[in-house]
């Protein structure tokens, strides 16, 4: 049959607008009218990324809009966090965690990134813990329960970090 429901992936809110990503284009949808407006294309973004030697996006489904008051989006390419201004078409900032990083947690309020390497926790380039084997920091403990699926928790301003420590 040719009749089927349209699958929409990656819908998210940016302030009062709904953002609908696709492979090649991001659209903004006005909730009251349903009017779609093109925000930016993957080709436009990739041109700027290539100029900055930051890699290329293969699709726009994983792009996030964590700032309701800024025309900026967040995405990762090859483990590198990239903040991109889609009004000015420019890379705002980039950060690549150290090799071996897992459990990355980007804080939109401060731009800090918490991550783990083996059993230790890092923020940006700095080691926060230096625990011996058998003591784990910054990762989920045992199993994901009560809607908790990570081991780090940023404060609202992004200047403090709470984390799980299991011995």
Locate the predicted segments by residue:
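Beta-propeller folds
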Residues: 1-167
